[in-house]
Amino acid sequence: MCIRDSISFLLSPLSIIYFIGFKVYEFFSKEVDIGVPVICVGNLVAGGSGKTPITIELRKYLSKKYSKIFVLTRGYKGKLKVPIIVSKNSNYLNVSDEAIIHAQNGLTCMAKNKKLGAELCKKNGANLILMDDGLQSKDIKKNFKILVVDDNYKFGNNFLLPAGPLRQTINSAKSNYDIMLIIRNGNGDSTLTTEKHKNVFYAEKKIKLKKLKYKDVFAFSGIGNNENFVNKLKELKINIKMIKNFPDHHN
């Protein structure tokens, strides 16, 4: 048994407590219909899985049909506790780097309380709200739910927090999404398609970096899964001379 497995085993009692707490939260929570269509882009694991870039692309696509799309984000590491409409010139320490990125692409609201945030979006004329994260939240009614899965990582060790990365059990998640969008797998042959998961789709965006092929680079990143970034550079035959990995949303 490796150290990581040992730690997961020791933390497993806390995962049981987490599971009970989540079920109590689900039982007593009541989703509110705010009167505006809501699409949620979420995941099952703590950390990055590609939700933000998917949300950005989804906004671009749906902007042909909806004139006033708001992205609603929790603003991970943002200091402000009250809902706020974010601009590209907002202080990232107050609203988070994630919210700034969304604001550079369109109307954005940062809110720790999703119900209050959704109401602020509606007050400002939103005719569609895209939630970046919040699949497990029961604050507001979601009209359509997209589960994003990184095929390289999947669901980690399949344990709930804190013994593993899962925010909810895999079985309970099967009834908590409309489509599963698998990223970082261009072959369409993920093992997830054989595990009775419904409505599985694949997403891949190819980026040409021919100019960097065989070039020496210093690689650094501050995302949820830095290993994916480094592996992609290696696949592109880029010579990595030095690597510096920062925590997710590093300032």
Regions flagged by a language model, labelled:
Residues 78-192:
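Phosphate/Mg2+-binding loops and adjacent switch elements
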Residues 56, 60, 64, 104, ...:
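Short, well-ordered alpha-helices that flank and scaffold nucleotide-derived cofactor binding pockets
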Residues 26-88:
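Walker A (P-loop) phosphate-binding motif
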Residues 15-24:
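N-terminal pre-Walker A segment at the start of P-loop NTPase domains
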Residues 1-5:
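Conserved small/polar residues in nucleotide/adenosyl-binding loops
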Residues 36, 85-89, 106-108, 143-146, ...:
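Active-site regions of enzymes building and remodeling cell-envelope glycoconjugates
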Residues 154-251:
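C-terminal accessory "lid"/substrate-recognition subdomains
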